[in-house]
Amino acid sequence: MDSWHTARPHGSRDLLTVDPLSQAVVGAAVPQSFAPKQHIGTITLLGALAGMAPDLDVLIRSSTDPLLFLEYHRQFTHSFFFIPFGGLICALAFWPFVRKRMRFRYIYIVTTAGYATHGLLDACTTYGTLLLWPFSFERIAWNTIAVIDPLFTIPLLAFIVAGVIRRSPAWPRFGLVLALCYLGLGYVQRDRAEAVGEQLASSRGHHDVAVSAKPTLGNVLLWKVIYRHEERFWVDAVRVGVMGGEPKVYPGGSVAVLDRASQFPWLADGSQQAKDLARFDWFSSGYLALDSRDANRVIDMRYSMLPNEIDGLWGIRLDRTAGNATHVTYEVKRSVDKTRFDNLLVMLIGQDASSISGVGAD
């Protein structure tokens, strides 16, 4: 049985950001790739710390506003235009510890190089990053890699360690080339999954639809494919191999697009809950639906444990009895049942859809 919990502001970012290790590894690899031998260890450390620094925006939170962290995470600290300032802040923070080894100007170059990688890596995922803030509030998401992917992180980490041990920038250069190739593979796989999604839509008589494919956790094989036709979202899982062969489709289902007027007719326009619903809609890029099990919960249906399910991992709960100044409640799903996990493995391996146990694709 699914278990939903009210999320604390400081504990709600579990899957909203690329894991810190990946950010540290990429942040270290770039400045290490041009580091002189005598400073390669120090530069690696500074780059790693600077690469993680933008995620300090998670400290922006409120005990009374549960959506504040959604509004500010991946915002100004992740913008292209903040990179020089972010690099400077990091350089000033690290300078007292390394000033006897390196000049401040070089420290600044290193920290800026590391800091600059963060927003770009986040934009490769699916959640959206405000790379052009403050000139645009568009959430840029290239949907090429999951927030956690060991096949991306571990090889690059190995090259960085080799670079430090061998005191050679050649190793991180090789690692960065490999990492870029993996991101390129994700780009190709995304397009292949979207092409399958377009075929599925056409087979249902749905034409001229915008199909979006999102990678599942830790791989670029299995994708959640979503498109909107009229007033419904349609969801399927698609596995596209990297060595050819026919893609495998794991059919999902459909759900009505959230319609505030008909589903929440009691919600006053100027109320805080109405404003929070609009904020959550912006965060989810419009992919909102009503939870089929709870008429007061709105889910971000882009993400689910199984890619062919319409069963959000997080959502907001509205309260009809709340006052005009009361915020919504932000909730996350914490339970992962064995059946769903087994079915996910079936999809990853590429077995037939008939091997999937019935947990209910909505």
Give a label for each model feature.
Residues 1-215:
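N-terminal membrane-targeting hydrophobic helices
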Residues 50, 123, 203-205, 217-219, ...:
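A generic structural signal for short, solvent-exposed coil/turn residues
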Residues 138, 218, 305:
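Residue-level detector of flexible, active-site-proximal loop/helix-junction positions
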Residues 194-210, 220-221, 231-244:
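Polar-ligand-bearing catalytic/cofactor-coordination segments
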Residues 214-217, 300-302:
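Fold-independent oxyanion-binding glycine-rich loops
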Residues 222-362:
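Extracytosolic and intramembrane catalytic regions of membrane-associated proteins
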